[in-house]
Amino acid sequence: MAVFTTVSQDEIARWLLDYDLGEVRALRGIASGIENSNFFLTMEQDGVTREYVLTIFERLQFDQLPYYLHLMDHLARHGICVPAPMPARDGEILRELKGKPATIVTRLPGASQLAPQPDHCAEVGAMLARMHIAGQDYPRKQPNLRSLAWWQQTTPEITPFLDAAQRKLLTEEIAHQTAFFGSGDYAALQGGPCHCDLFRDNALFDTDSAGNHRLGGFFDFYFAGDDKWLFDLAVTVNDWCIDLATGTIDMERAQAMLRAYHAVRPLTAVEAAHWQDMLRAGALRFWVSRLWDFYLPREADMLQPHDPTHFERILRRRIDDAAALPWI
């Protein structure tokens, strides 16, 4: 179980005296998650039971968290299905628990859909577009901290662990992305707050009694940052719309996502021209981070890192797939 800081129900009940959420009825650790300790929290107030998620942050510090939490609050207030942070009586949404930053957010309905079909992808695409539009007037600013500058900084640290073919691929792709990021076309791409990590396990789908499903929402915004919207879409397609064994794009799923996104926020000609570049950028970002996690684990790492070859394979596919990429 990925609960690294333990806390008892009695401890939580005392901590929650500063909130107006009612009485604690249950506290259960959540097995998923790598970066934080997460718990399902059941509260009862005026005879009504409500579900929340308590997160204790294991790596991020107090000064690193306001962008993410206030973005979630902003999006929730604009009708986007994301966890809404709950304020304490003093209005603060971030407080200390066991010497670490902690927050309580609303629990989204549903479960992750790990074998998505085109209709799932369409719902994700439409909500991603709505999220991008809703975030346009978010006042806080923070760049995507895992973008080009981080790739450039990290590459010299990981190249000693790579074979000659991998070093060549990484060096050439960094050069390609450096040129792309410095171009006028890149500067012209629209952007704003992005999730930057919208994999299929960071969204939930709810199913009704008739078997119909609906998107319950997006969560885990702790890699979010200001970036190009096309990058966020590329990251999402590179996970939701591929064959996991080969990295090949499933055209039906990808076009369902792209068309649903486009129906909400029309994609532009310059975005079409650089779709391959962004799919490559999305693959590179996660290849670099997985290489870094795999070969240079931090002392506090507590779980097995992901296999980096998955995104190496996806990057090679995106470079070779120029004539067979999905679009609207």
UniProtKB/Swiss-Prot annotation:
Q: Which GO terms describe its biological process?
A: threonine biosynthetic process
**Pathway participation:** Amino-acid biosynthesis; L-threonine biosynthesis; L-threonine from L-aspartate: step 4/5
Keyword Transcription set for record: no
Listed name of the protein: Homoserine kinase
Q: Which UniProt keywords apply?
A: Amino-acid biosynthesis, ATP-binding, Kinase, Nucleotide-binding, Threonine biosynthesis, Transferase
The GO terms describing molecular function are: ATP binding; homoserine kinase activity
Which E.C. number(s) belong to this protein? 2.7.1.39
Query: Which cysteines link up through disulfide bonds?
Result: none
Q: Which InterPro entries match?
A: Aminoglycoside_PTrfase, Homoserine_kinase_II, Kinase-like_dom_sf, Pseudomonas-type_ThrB
| Gene transcribed to yield this protein | thrB
Q: What class of enzyme is it?
A: transferase
Q: Look up the domain of life of the source.
A: Bacteria
Catalysed reactions listed for this entry: L-homoserine + ATP = O-phospho-L-homoserine + ADP + H(+)
In terms of PANTHER family, this protein maps to: AMINOGLYCOSIDE PHOSPHOTRANSFERASE DOMAIN-CONTAINING PROTEIN, AMINOGLYCOSIDE PHOSPHOTRANSFERASE DOMAIN-CONTAINING PROTEIN-RELATED
Task: Give the protein family.
Answer: Belongs to the pseudomonas-type ThrB family.
